[in-house]
């Protein structure tokens, strides 16, 4: 394409999404794409990494990506501008993807920018991970979501019901019967729901998304579970051809300053990176030993962070020299239920600064921080080995306990001036001690012998037993008294962060009451020690001596109430969500008289 054709292409620029798509479509697409989806803005300057684009098209075969050899001399990254973005969905799988039009950065074309201040209508939405009962029968809608995102029901009717009309990302309309019934009563989608799940081939673990606009327009979408992600069938077009196509398209655009289109999937690695984000990541200067955190999508559709350490910096492929793409080799702190990469790109992770990013225990968050001059030189007697222990902070996931030391930095300057190490905590002045003199004095004063004349080595008797107080133990005891016995401000004592967190956890953990029909005395069960519904049922059977009667559900039903006193059946929600909202567990006879909550 000649350079003169660039201006003629400008009227074809489309904008953030296809003009035929509405704002409701855009919001539904983003929810179906997931919490980690990062789409660039129209007109934004970005870096395009061909290696990442090739990795996406080769995901179906998982070849050795580091052995990929470019067919032509193409830079590892190209600076481009975003010309247009179209948000689309695959016909068969309902997987979201975006077609992003790029142009090598040039001033020859005036690129429209996205108006951030334009009016955005108010939308309500909710997502839910489907359970086995959701896919085999009616769909249970939690009361909060039903009130916020679905049209209101006429509760004056004996059986409140209505028909919902929802549109998916393909423009297809689906009709659902929404009613409020059952024992206990709850919001259900019945008629039409089975046809929807069958057509979309939904299974337990998939996610359903509902979006409702100000005008009452209802949209519905889905998001497949991670293990169901489809790939491009290699039988349709060879992997080699796709690889050559990606590189040839980028090379042609780079040489001729013309537009080219790339396909981006939300769950793929980010190979289109904001210019500012790239510079920030590179300026972090990740080195071997640096600590970091990285975001992933959890099984419950939520964002989760994992921590790790950089153990190497090298090119991902020998054919792409000095490329920032996956040039950091990492080691993860703990096991995960899904596969994580052992090489990542700098913009995918966040650098952990030990002195700044370690959360303080909530017990101390309201206390006034003392100024450096309040601590002064009174803490200069602290031994550096004690201050610098446990300095590997951040080796934890969001769900694991924190092991935080009182020390947040390990630099020569801090060792020379230990008072700076305690700036993050308010500590009362401690008496100035000289450990060298104290150690000698304590050794001399605490030696008791049975005879006045014996041989000594460094003040210790070599002949008769001596009663000697360990100087190191004495020092540690003194520090322990000063750090654990002194108070922050006026009332709070200093404890280890692990102890504080353990105490907070135990204080918030409460047992859940269990009420059974026909039994006067209530029982209680501790959900925090159980790992799922199976263990809960076994625990309930043991509490009421039912011996297998709850597992069959032939005689008894198990329900629970939430903070709004709404009754719902046990087992319809993911276990963590159930533990968060359960107020009381109810056991009542199947088909019998309703159990009144006490």
From Swiss-Prot:
One of its GO terms (molecular function) is DNA-binding transcription factor activity. The keyword Transferase does not apply. Gene3D superfamilies: 2.30.30.1040, DNA-binding pseudobarrel domain, Phosphatidylinositol 3-kinase Catalytic Subunit, Chain A, domain 1. Residues 124-226 bind DNA. Residues 509-590 form the PB1 domain. Keywords: Auxin signaling pathway, DNA-binding, Nucleus, Transcription, Transcription regulation. Homodimers and heterodimers. This is Auxin response factor 22. It comes from Arabidopsis thaliana (Mouse-ear cress). The lineage of its organism: Eukaryota, Viridiplantae, Streptophyta, Embryophyta, Tracheophyta. The gene is ARF22.
């Amino acid at each position: 394409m000649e350079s003169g054709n660039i201006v003629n292409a400008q009227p074809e620029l489309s904008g953030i999404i296809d003009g035929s798509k509405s704002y409701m479509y855009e919001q539904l697409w983003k929810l179906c794409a997931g919490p980690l989806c990062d789409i660039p803005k129209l007109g934004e300057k970005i870096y395009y990494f061909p290696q990442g684009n090739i990795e996406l098209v080769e995901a179906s075969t998982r070849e050795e990506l580091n052995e990929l050899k470019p067919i032509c001399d193409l830079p590892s990254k190209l600076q481009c501008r975003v010309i247009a973005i179209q948000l689309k969905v695959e016909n068969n799988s309902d997987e979201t993807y975006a077609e992003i039009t790029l142009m090598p950065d040039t001033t020859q074309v005036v690129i429209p920018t996205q108006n951030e201040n334009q009016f955005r209508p108010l939308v309500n939405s909710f997502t839910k991970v489907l359970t086995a009962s959701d896919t085999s029968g009616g769909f249970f809608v939690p009361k909060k979501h039903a009130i916020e995102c679905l049209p209101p029901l006429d509760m004056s009717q004996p059986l409140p019901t209505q028909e919902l009309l929802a549109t998916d990302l393909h423009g297809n309309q689906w009709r659902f019967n929404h009613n409020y019934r059952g024992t206990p009563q709850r919001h259900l989608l019945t008629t039409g729901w089975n046809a929807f799940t069958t057509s979309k081939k939904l299974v337990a673990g998939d996610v359903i998304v509902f979006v409702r606009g100000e005008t009452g327009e209802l949209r519905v979408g889905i998001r497949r579970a991670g293990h169901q992600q489809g790939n491009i069938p290699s039988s349709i077009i060879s992997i080699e051809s796709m690889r050559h196509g990606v590189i040839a398209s980028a090379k042609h655009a780079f040489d001729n300053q013309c537009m080219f289109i790339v396909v981006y999937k939300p769950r793929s690695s980010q190979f289109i990176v904001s210019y500012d984000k790239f510079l920030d990541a590179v300026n972090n200067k990740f080195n071997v030993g640096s600590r970091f955190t990285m975001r992933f999508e959890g099984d419950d559709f939520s964002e989760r962070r994992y921590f790790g350490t950089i153990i190497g910096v090298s090119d991902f492929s020998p054919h792409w020299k000095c490329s920032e793409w996956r040039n950091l080799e990492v080691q993860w702190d703990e096991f995960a239920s899904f596969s994580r990469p052992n090489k990542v790109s700098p913009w995918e992770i966040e650098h952990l600064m030990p002195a700044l990013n370690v959360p303080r225990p909530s017990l101390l968050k309201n206390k006034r921080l003392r100024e450096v001059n309040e601590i002064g030189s009174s803490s200069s007697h602290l031994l550096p080995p004690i201050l610098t222990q446990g300095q590997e902070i951040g080796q934890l996931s969001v769900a694991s306990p924190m092991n935080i030391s009182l020390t947040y930095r390990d630099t020569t300057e801090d060792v020379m001036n230990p008072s700076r190490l305690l700036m993050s905590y308010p500590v009362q002045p401690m008496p100035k001690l000289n450990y060298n003199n104290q150690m000698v004095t304590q050794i001399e004063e605490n030696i008791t012998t049975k005879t006045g004349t014996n041989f000594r080595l460094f003040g210790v008797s070599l002949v008769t037993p001596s009663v000697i107080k360990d100087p190191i133990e004495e020092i540690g005891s003194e520090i322990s008294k000063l750090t654990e016995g002194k108070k922050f401000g006026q009332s709070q004592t200093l404890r280890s962060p692990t102890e504080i967190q353990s105490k907070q956890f135990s204080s918030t953990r409460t047992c859940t009451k269990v009420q059974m029909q026909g039994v006067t005395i209530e029982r209680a069960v501790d959900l925090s020690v159980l790992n799922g519904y199976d263990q809960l049922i076994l625990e309930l059977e043991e509490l009421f001596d039912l011996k297998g009667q709850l597992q069959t559900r032939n005689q008894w039903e198990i329900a629970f109430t939430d903070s709004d006193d709404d009754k719902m059946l046990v087992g319809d929600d993911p276990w963590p969500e159930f533990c968060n909202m359960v107020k009381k567990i109810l056991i009542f006879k199947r088909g019998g008289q309703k159990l009144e909550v006490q």
